[in-house]
Regions:
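Inter-Walker segment of RecA-like/P-loop motor cores
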Residues: 69-105
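Post-DEXD/H (motif II) to motif III coupling segment of the RecA-like Helicase ATP-binding lobe
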Residues: 116-175
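Walker A/P-loop
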Residues: 19-41
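Conserved pre-motif I regulatory segment
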Residues: 1-27
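Conserved RecA-like ASCE ATPase "motif II neighborhood" in helicase/translocase motors
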Residues: 92-127
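Conserved Walker A/P-loop ATP-binding site and its immediately adjacent core
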Residues: 35-37, 44-71
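Loop/turn-to-beta-strand initiation segments
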Residues: 50-51, 89-92, 109-111, 132-137
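Conserved interdomain hinge at the start of the Helicase C-terminal
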Residues: 19, 42, 186-197
Length: 197
């Protein structure tokens, strides 16, 4: 079951797509449930007879994303070496951008969800250019990267961190820090590259 702000995000994405946008960033705070929202979006893509792909910016996030799809009971294929969940016939694929950049075979997809879209890669730009009819939805809590607007047409912000706090979806943050830290006895060494460790 989606939370109201996740449903709002999906409705705002639909509205943006109906306006003709094919490159949209969903900007949502940490703990919004961006991956859960992405799972729901891709479920609807498959229900409409289309195919989707969830693109991670790091190989490490592939497994985490797979677990979210598994919790929803969704059949997905994983594009990663000889991963035990490789299934090229699945309507939804999960892949890292690194894997996609090395593959000669590119899956067919109608909607691509790009996790952590603020870390934009050259291959992602090429993928977006080659697939001009495909809808790309970027997910980010920090969509402030220089040049991101060159790749995306619309920005959706369904809820802010403050609103999530007000609705008790997040706990208030407490900050702690020292007044003065004495680093005079900390030992450092010069690295061969010229830096300091």
């Amino acid at each position: 079951v989606l939370r109201p702000h996740q449903e709002r995000a999906i409705n705002q994405l639909r509205h943006s797509i109906k306006k003709g946008n094919k490159r949209i960033v969903l900007a949502a705070p940490c703990s919004f449930g961006k991956t859960i929202t992405a799972v729901e979006i891709l479920i609807n893509v498959v229900k409409n007879g289309k195919k989707g792909i969830f693109i991670c910016d790091r190989i490490k996030l592939v497994q985490q994303s797979l677990e979210a799809f598994d919790r929803a009971g969704i059949r997905v294929g994983v594009m990663q070496g000889d991963h035990w969940r490789t299934d090229p016939n699945a309507d939804i694929q999960i892949a890292s951008i690194q894997t996609l950049s090395r593959r000669r075979y590119q899956p067919i997809f109608h909607v691509a969800i790009v996790d952590e879209c603020h870390t934009h890669y050259k291959h992602l730009t090429e993928l977006m250019e080659k697939n001009s009819k495909v809808i790309f939805i970027g997910l980010s809590a920090t969509p402030y990267s220089k040049g991101l607007g060159k790749h995306y047409q619309d920005l959706i912000v369904p809820i802010t961190t403050e609103q999530l706090l007000d609705k008790d979806y997040l706990c208030p943050v407490k900050y702690y820090g020292g007044n003065h830290v004495d680093l005079s006895k900390v030992k450092t060494k010069r690295l061969p590259t010229g830096g300091v460790d």
